[in-house]
Amino acid sequence: MKKTIIYTAFWLATAGIALTSCEDIFGGFLDKQPSNELTEEEVFSQWTTTREFHFDTYNFLRHGACRINNSWMDAATDLAETSYASGGTRTSFNIGNYYASGAATELTGTWEHYYRGIRKCNMLLKNIDDVPKATDDSEEAHATYVKQYKAEAHFLRAYFYWEMFLRYGPVPLVTDVLDPDGDLLSNYTTRPSLKEYVVDFILKELKDCEEGLMDKATSAESGNPGRISQPMARALYSRVMLYMASDRFRSESGISWQQAADAAQSFMTDYGTLYGLYTTDTDPKTCYTNAILKNAHDEKNNETIFWRNDVAVGWGAIYNDTPVGEGGNGGLCPSQNLVDMYDMANGQSPFSSYDETGAPVYNGTATPAINNASGYKSNDPYSNRDPRLAATVLYNGVNWGNGIINVLKGQRDNPQGNANATPTGYYTRKYIPEVILNNNHTGSNYRNWIIIRYAEILLNYAEALNEAGGSRADV
């Protein structure tokens, strides 16, 4: 019988789970190489290698924006364009040829990526009950670890299948460890129904695993940053329930808006005291910026529920997303469509008419009709806007980094002959830690990729309750 080979890097044990951008330390388990080879039996013969194997599964939580050649996929929408010209990236976006680039693995490799993560979860669940305890652990501690690891594997598997669903719809639900030399197709010739896939599997996995996970306090300890905890399972459950209650899926899922509202409310009831909106500053723009960038543990960001833990990064991690006047490659450039979607600070819409996408209607004119009651001024379009606009978009005249953004033709951020200069008049501010630009770009900062924030739970509740016909006061 052919033995499955698994590769391990033993330095991971000393690294804890402060995960780096390493995609997959163990992912080549079907390849054969001369060093660091362990069979499946050897990996699960001791707790140390089992622990390493399990923690590596966290590497399948994707971090960063989905990209083609260093440019975010938002550029494929009407909300942004890419300024990144290298390797034909801009051309790929403009003509929709997203697969031409060899760097489009986050599109072409998604299927393989998540099934590899799922396989690792299945392998752990198959073997962990037979792994001997570590010498220094008591029987009670070992039993706790086994319970936690199994619960985390169930969560991660459910999350990976949910990500697959968002891209492909229901895909084959593989819960066993398939033999690469065996029959891989006979049991997976038909798609599961939406109810079988989401309601009977994903939602059940999330509900069943919650009790075995760490509580938030244990997850927040220094050795466990980023570990899956009970609130994460409940939060993902709320997200999935909201999708399933929508008009798109409700007839197949059987889930109502009220059930989705109840799911969000259960999080607020059981875990709401542990989380809150990140309001550590009197400036709303700063609060929003920090809610996105601040680390959940070291920087006490209690709005973050579920995120991909990462390490502090420097200039090399952001220069492809930074304005050319700062020495970067421009990257994702927000469009006027996106800017126009932001309301005024008083909550009113700046324009009088919008289409179904949320963009203002131009009706053949150079500018959309202004809602005069909103206070919007066409000669000062960025003043008194929703503060999230200034936290998301770098526009002309704003002070940022080591200078003032100037996108006028031939100026600092739109110089003649620079192929990466913004084509829209805007650059991205969100997700870019400005502190990295200090001292000649020698600063560093965490760039954690948030998957679920507490703000989403509040919005899930409000949206579902509103659709269910809840009272205005409750909404």
PLM regions: where:
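Membrane-proximal, proline-rich intrinsically disordered regions
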Residues: 22-73, 383
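Conserved, well-structured interaction surfaces
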Residues: 46-64, 87-168, 187-200, 204-222, ...
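Structural helix-adjacent loops and short alpha-helical linkers that scaffold large soluble proteins
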Residues: 134-147, 249-255, 468-474
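Aromatic-lined, polymer-binding surfaces characteristic
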Residues: 164, 170, 179, 195-196, ...
